């Protein structure tokens, strides 16, 4: 039933908004590029027969009424913002597939008991203000007031950017949904990994979203001459950092489920011929079970302290962020499982290592996700790609999942 070609054409058209010379997409929140993207998607929503509006957080919403307009709403969507020089599938696939689902329903005269709303959430990525999931936090009523003071690289605060975009930060609480008004939230998203590709499958059903902790390590010692300081006398923070990073890899591997990453490292003063006086790096540690993740962190912390003592360097750690894992709803997973079977695809279960808006919505409603195969597992890159055929399959599974949820009492 889904028109895969229409979905693909819209994905490609939206991918031109914010396109960079590299071929990547930069579409940050509350910018002209995001406004153009919202306007384009709003036109798709109207074409699909939806009532279109934006809430106080700037979330773009298209509503299809149900036979009972007072029934709880089924939400389906994702986000339109991107990272710097990202891809054109991360986020937009979920929004545009949601539009395709309700447009297909309307074109075939399909009515549902529950209303359906397609949502394009504001600033999921957090690339501009280094604080993400603003729209979904606002909808859940959990956006902290201090988030409005987060600033971008040019010193513009989130509150100022909202005002520039025509929004009133003081009205943000109005975006919160009342308890008991949302039946479920379903999101179609690219996997951003290689699990489905290795399994040879176009789609998978997400079991849960991993919880993360970010920990900043600072290791300090004396800055000394690289040539004049014998190896036996060195107190080298860089060598200690390298050893600790190997420990992170070792401890994460032990569980079979935990992932540990150091993707950011700064060395001071940064001279070729200077033993560093300070090294800073940030650990990203994730697991679907908080207790497993926390056990891994404790093991890393103990071994890191031992390394620091043995090397006679100073070690401090600071927890920057923590996010609890969220398990997907059995009701949503079962609906997605039935959809896969109906379409002839074996149900394949996998966790999401990346965070998504559903994490924020979980306190107010059951959530679920469907993944589409990513080519080579690449994401947050101009090389991000999922095939037209896989996107269409994902949209079909989404259609049958949403239909089940919207028909039930």
UniProtKB/Swiss-Prot annotation:
The record marks 234 as: Necessary for dimerization. Signal peptide: none annotated. Residues 208-325 are annotated as: Involved in dimerization. Its EC number is 3.5.1.87. It catalyses: an N-carbamoyl-L-alpha-amino acid + H2O + 2 H(+) = an L-alpha-amino acid + NH4(+) + CO2; N-carbamoyl-L-methionine + H2O + 2 H(+) = L-methionine + NH4(+) + CO2; N-acetyl-L-methionine + H2O = L-methionine + acetate; N-carbamoyl-L-alanine + H2O + 2 H(+) = L-alanine + NH4(+) + CO2. Requires divalent metal cations for activity. Binds 2 divalent metal cations per subunit. An N-carbamoyl-L-alpha-amino acid binds at residues 192, 225, 273, 286, 355. A divalent metal cation 1 binds at residues 79, 90, 189. InterPro entries: Amidase_Cbmase, Bact_exopeptidase_dim_dom, Peptidase_M20, Peptidase_M20_dimer. Its cofactor is Mn(2+); Ni(2+); Co(2+); Fe(2+). Keywords: Cobalt, Hydrolase, Iron, Manganese, Metal-binding, Nickel. A divalent metal cation 2 binds at residues 90, 125, 380. It holds the Pfam family M20_dimer. PANTHER family: ALLANTOATE DEIMINASE-RELATED. Belongs to the peptidase M20 family. Homodimer. Catalyzes the hydrolysis of aliphatic N-carbamoyl-L-alpha-amino acids to free L-alpha-amino acids. Is strictly L-specific since it is inactive toward N-carbamoyl-D-alpha-amino acids. Is not able to use aromatic N-carbamoyl-L-alpha-amino acids like N-carbamoyl-L-tryptophan and N-carbamoyl-L-phenylalanine as substrates, but is also able to hydrolyze N-acetyl-L-methionine. This is N-carbamoyl-L-amino acid amidohydrolase. It comes from Geobacillus stearothermophilus.
